[in-house]
C-alpha cells in the first residue's frame, strides 16, 4: 500500500529555470506547461513523465514480496481506480488505485490513495504478509513480525540508514 505522494497543488504555468531543458525532460511525451510541480519531485504526478504511483512505488514493494515469497511473475493482473477524490488538482495520475496480481498459489493486492489517512501510520508505504505463523509488516525503513504466539519482533533497516542517514524522512 502507499498513501500520498500525488501533488494536490494547482500552480500556474511558470518560466522554467535557465538550466532546465524542457525538450530533453519531456522526450517523446506530449509537452506540458512548466510549473513548480515539473521538477524536482512532483513530476510523478503526471502521466506524461511517469506511470503514476503504481508504476513508481508499487513496483518496489511488489518486487520485495515476490522475492520474499519466491513468487515469480504474476499470471494475471487486474486494476481499477482513477481520479476519484482530488478532482481539482493539476495532477493527472490516479489518486486511487487497487490492483490484484494473481500468482499460482495466492493473490498480492496493491492499494494506494493520495488522500485520507493511512490505515497503519507506521507503514504508509509497505507490505503486509499474512501467514500461518503470524504477520510480517515491512517497508524500506523497518519490519515487524507479529507471531500468532509469542512476542513481536522489530528491526530497523540499519545498514542503509547508517550508510545514508539522509534517507530517513
Give the predicted meaning of each segment.
Residues 1-52, 56-169:
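Contiguous beta-strand/loop segments that form the cofactor/metal-binding neighborhood of enzyme cores
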Amino acid at each position: 500500500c502507499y498513501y500520498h505522494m500525488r501533488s494536490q497543488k494547482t500552480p500556474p504555468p511558470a518560466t522554467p529555470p535557465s538550466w532546465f531543458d524542457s525538450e530533453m525532460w519531456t522526450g517523446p511525451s506530449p509537452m506540458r506547461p512548466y510549473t513548480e510541480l515539473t521538477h524536482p519531485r512532483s513530476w510523478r504526478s503526471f502521466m506524461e513523465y511517469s506511470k503514476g504511483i503504481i508504476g513508481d512505488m508499487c513496483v518496489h514493494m511488489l518486487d520485495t514480496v515476490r522475492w520474499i515469497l519466491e513468487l515469480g511473475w504474476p499470471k494475471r493482473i487486474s486494476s481499477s481506480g482513477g481520479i476519484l477524490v482530488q478532482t481539482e488538482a493539476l495532477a493527472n495520475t490516479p489518486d486511487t488505485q487497487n490492483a490484484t496480481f494473481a500468482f499460482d498459489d495466492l493473490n498480492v493486492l496493491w492499494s494506494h490513495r493520495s488522500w485520507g489517512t493511512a490505515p497503519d501510520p507506521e507503514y504508509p508505504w509497505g507490505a503486509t504478509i499474512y501467514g500461518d505463523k503470524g504477520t510480517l509488516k515491512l517497508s524500506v525503513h523497518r519490519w515487524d513480525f507479529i507471531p500468532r504466539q509469542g512476542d513481536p519482533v522489530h528491526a530497523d533497516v540499519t545498514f542503509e540508514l547508517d550508510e545514508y542517514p539522509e534517507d530517513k524522512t
